[in-house]
Amino acid sequence: MTLKDKKAIKKILRIAKKHPDLYSKAEVMYAKIIKKRLKRMKVTLVQATPKPEENMAYIARVSNPSNQDNENYSGLLKYCIKHNHWSVFEQAFMTLEIETTRAIAAQILRHRSFTFQEFSQRYAKSNELGKIQLPDLRRQDLKNRQNSIDDLDPFTKQKLEAQMITLFSSAQSLYNQMIEYGVAKECARMVLPMCTPTRIYMTGSCRSWIHYIQLRSAHGTQKEHMDIANACKSL
């Protein structure tokens, strides 16, 4: 979704509040759903190696002690990338806080060069991270089983989203009821959908982050995961 789309949604909600007769209830409801989605994914910097570029360049010049304090490190790091001297980029680290869904978290956790800490549904109630949000619906790419195309009919979307609202509300109510009856959280969580929100702390070296961003911002990555990779890149 582009910045222009985001501004259009905010404008619809602002005008609808002042002039409720201009938009149908369905249009306003749909705009609110999209607005919630914009807040669902969030990437925040927690900590990083101080002066990472300077630190990596200093270490890279370990065999040239007389030149280790050279402040011109930009060219050196570009040279290391060009010639695949990746060990240099293992000397700086970064930790990010990522808010996403359980479905996307499962994909992120497959990157084994990172260390993770994830919100535990066994220890805490799942709704502590907010309500279950509706996922974006896209058409299946018939030529690539792991790809989707964002051209699904809007009326089909609205019809299916109405059913999802009912389904998710029912799942959340059942989950709450199970907790009230004393069912263990590790058992009650089984009724929750994959788009249940979660939070991950992801720590890795600069080398790992470069590889992750290159891989997950490329074509073929699920859109929700691609958005996270691009957000990581912007940091």
Region annotations inferred by a language model:
Residues 1-235:
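Family-specific signature for flavin-dependent thymidylate synthase
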